[in-house]
Amino acid sequence: MPSNISTRLHYQHKSLIDLIDGLSDEQVRRQVNIGKWSIFENIVHLQTYQHLFIARVNQILEGTNPAFPRYSAEADPSFLDNCSLSTREILQDLITTRKDMTSGMVQFSHDDLIKTAEHPAFGKMNLLQWMNFFLLHEAHHLFTVFKLAAELKKS
């Protein structure tokens, strides 16, 4: 596995701790922009989607080019259930699950990494591309959390 993927799998998510440092739980849960997710909802989305991603990776490894539907957090009962948990519980699960996920993924063989699945918008992607997609999607939400936290720290 390329080091740029393995390094991000190991460490990228940990920036969340720094991004929300100094914010109260009330601030983390505050909706800064009307109709948009709070920091908390972005974090819950990352935590919930990570579990879905693991399931999809397993389907890719076990199947022959499976096709996945578009994911919608609002339609995912796990997302809604997880919104009732504390920020600490969500972060703990995100970090623990990522550690387990990464330790398995860095062991994938070349044959594993070239297995494919269909993405509804991007078409056929191999497992390495799926990992990159996962990390870029996560980075997008981390940047959103960064912007929301900056806004909250100004007020």
Label each region the model flagged:
Residues R8-Q12, P77-I114, F134:
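Acidic/histidine-rich alpha-helical segments that form the ligand environment
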Residues R29-A73, T116-S155:
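Short, contiguous alpha-helical
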Residues M1-I17:
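Extreme N-terminal tail/first-helix region
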Residues M1-P2, F79-S84, P120-L127:
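A short, mixed-charge helix-start or loop-turn motif at secondary-structure junctions
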Residues G22-Q27, V106-I114, A150-S155:
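Surface-exposed helix-capping loop/turn segments at secondary-structure junctions
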Residues H13, I17-D21, H51-I54, N58, ...:
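Structural signal for well-ordered, non-membrane alpha-helices
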